[in-house]
Design a protein with these regions (language model features):
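Short basic helix-loop element that most often maps to the first helix and adjoining turn
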Residues: 4-23
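Key DNA-contact positions within bacterial/archaeal DNA-binding proteins
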Residues: 18, 29, 58
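Recognition helix of helix-turn-helix/homeodomain-like DNA-binding domains
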Residues: 26-39
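Short, conserved catalytic or interaction motifs in soluble domains
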Residues: 36, 55, 65
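DNA major-groove recognition helix of helix-turn-helix/homeodomain DNA-binding modules
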Residues: 44-59
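Short, charged recognition helix plus adjacent turn
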Residues: 62-69
């Protein structure tokens, strides 16, 4: 799964990973893992991230071809 969280963080005033983590009540390490594609967030966390970044879940996360198999 491809993530666009980093792009949206910078479009929303260059939020740091820690600032975003604080906004959604998770650790910075969780944000790092999501951005690197090492961790898929729960539906609830994905919705919260989208709300805080003023976008949609679909804009934050994209399935890649390999994810369809």
């Amino acid at each position: 799964m491809k993530t666009n969280i980093r792009r949206f963080r910078f479009e929303r005033g260059e939020l740091s990973q820690q600032q975003l983590a604080d906004m959604v009540s998770v650790s910075r390490q969780t944000i790092v893992a999501i951005e690197r594609g090492n961790y898929s967030p729960s539906v609830k966390l994905a919705l919260i991230l989208a709300r805080k970044l003023e976008t949609t879940v679909e804009a934050l996360f994209e399935l890649e071809e390999k994810d369809h198999d």
